Amino acid sequence: MKQQKAMLIALIVICLTVIVTALVTRKDLCEVRIRTGQTEVAVFTAYEPEE
């Protein structure tokens, strides 16, 4: 049980770190690209504002 709780806390910390890093380095979060060597991960957010 303690190991699961520790893993959950670690996952939350990693997610928060990624979000904060994206907020600091990007003007918006509609497109985020991470490149490592030959691997690229691209995340796109599509949304329509409500009228």
Curated annotation (Swiss-Prot):
Function: Toxic component of a type I toxin-antitoxin (TA) system. When overexpressed kills cells within 2 minutes; causes collapse of the transmembrane potential and arrest of respiration.
Family: Belongs to the Hok/Gef family.
Lineage, highest ranks first: Bacteria, Pseudomonadati, Pseudomonadota, Gammaproteobacteria, Enterobacterales
UniProt keyword terms in alphabetical order: Cell inner membrane, Cell membrane, Membrane, Toxin-antitoxin system, Transmembrane, Transmembrane helix
Entry's localization field: Cell inner membrane
Any one annotated GO CC term: plasma membrane
Miscellaneous comment as given in the Swiss-Prot or TrEMBL entry: Probably inactive in strain K12 MG1655 due to a genetic locus rearrangement, the locus for its antisense antitoxin RNA is missing.
Coarse class of the protein's main subcellular location: membrane
Name this polypeptide is given: Toxic protein HokD
Keyword Transmembrane helix among UniProt keywords: yes
Membrane spanning stretches: 5-25
UniProt key word Signal: no
Membrane association type: Single-pass membrane protein
